[in-house]
Each structure stands twice: as structure tokens, then as C-alpha cells.
Amino acid sequence: MTMLFGFCASSSVIADETQNAKQARRIFNHTYDMVFGPQGSTLQYNVNIIGVMKVKGKIWYKGKKKRYEESRYLSWSDGVKYSRVDMKKKTVTLFDANNPNKDKYESKFTFNPLDFDYYVEDGGSDFIVTLNAHKKAKCNIKHAKAIIDKKTRAPKSLKIKVLWFWTSINISHFKSGDISDELFTFPATKYKDYTWIDNRLKK
């Protein structure tokens, strides 16, 4: 489910934005940098894709590196190779890290920050940042609402409308920084008895 946290934010300033929109974009970008910046981060998530699936797990980021753990699936990506373990089928599948086919949902969550209008509301101890896609936007995400802690700027929840369905993500145990590179090294010997499938492009 890593695609749910793969937003591509931008610090670009839109000349005709309102003050509220500029503030909303700054808040969103600050939190994005806490999650996806070079210092790395980790969080726990509980995802509900309405009418499709529910899943919870833990994820780590650091630059182009990524790792997650769920009840059935585990994955490690060191920025070059992506390794996914299916605990039920006892398989290890390898992909190039930049292959969009490594996750069947990933292509549905395309996001361009310039395709949205931003708006922020006061939610008491939180900021409520709403993103609405422009009518001519090509991305699949049409609406998004992020709940961000005012004091820590940590993400608390995210609600996304993709095409016709809604996805809700509750976030907890967020930490930014102090993420070791060793976390993203795939422990191949641990799964040596599994069936291995290599889907990397051959050179």
C-alpha cells in the first residue's frame, strides 16, 4: 500500500493564489518534507479503500528508499531493487524500484501538486488542508483532505477520492528523522526457501 503515501509535493508558488491557499500549500509541503525528506521517517497506517479492501501496517522512508510491513506482505526497496515477500504464498518477487507495476494500485494514485486548489481550515489542535483538483487535471486523485497536527506538523489522517471511490488513511506513531539505511536492506537469506520470481528488466 505504499502508493497511498507517494504524493509528489512542490514548493512552487502560484502567483494568483489567495493568502489562504498559500498558507495551505506551505503547511502541506512542510509535512510532506517531514515524511519524504532526506532525514527519513516512519509511521503506522490503517487504510480503508471503501468497498475494496482494508489493510494496516508500518512504513519507513528515506530518500528513494522504502520499506513496509503488513500481515501478509513485506517489502524492501533500496532505491534500485524492490523486493516483495508474500507470506501466504511463500514467494519473493523482485522488481526494479522504479517499475510502476510493482504495486497494482500505484498507478491509480497519480498526483501533480499543480493540478489542485489548496484550502486550510482551523480544526482546533489541527490544520485541515483540503485539495480539490482542477476540472482539466489529468491526475486520478480528485479530492484530498489532510489532518495535520498544529504543534508537531505530523500527519494524522488523509482522505482521498480516486475516480469514484474514497480511501481513508489513519496515521499514528509518526517519527521524522533518525532512520538507519540498514532498515532498507532485504534479508534475502531469511527467505531462501521461498519461491523467487525475478521481474526486473534484463540488461
Q: Where do the PLM segments sit?
A:
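Short, solvent-exposed coil/turn segments at beta-strand boundaries
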Residues: 37, 59-67, 76-82, 123-124, ...
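Short glycine/serine/proline-enriched coil/turn segments at secondary-structure junctions
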Residues: 50-52, 75-76, 136-140
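N-terminal leader/targeting segments and the immediate start of mature chains
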Residues: 9-53, 60, 64-65, 189-203
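Short beta-strand segments that buttress and anchor functional surface loops
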Residues: 44-48, 67-71, 129-136, 157-161
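An acidic-aromatic
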Residues: 58-105, 165-168
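Bacterial N-terminal signal peptides
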Residues: 1-7
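Non-transmembrane domains of secretory- and envelope-associated proteins
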Residues: 13-20, 123-125, 135-144, 151-203
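Surface-exposed, polar helix/loop patches in the mature regions of secreted/periplasmic/lumenal proteins
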Residues: 83-138
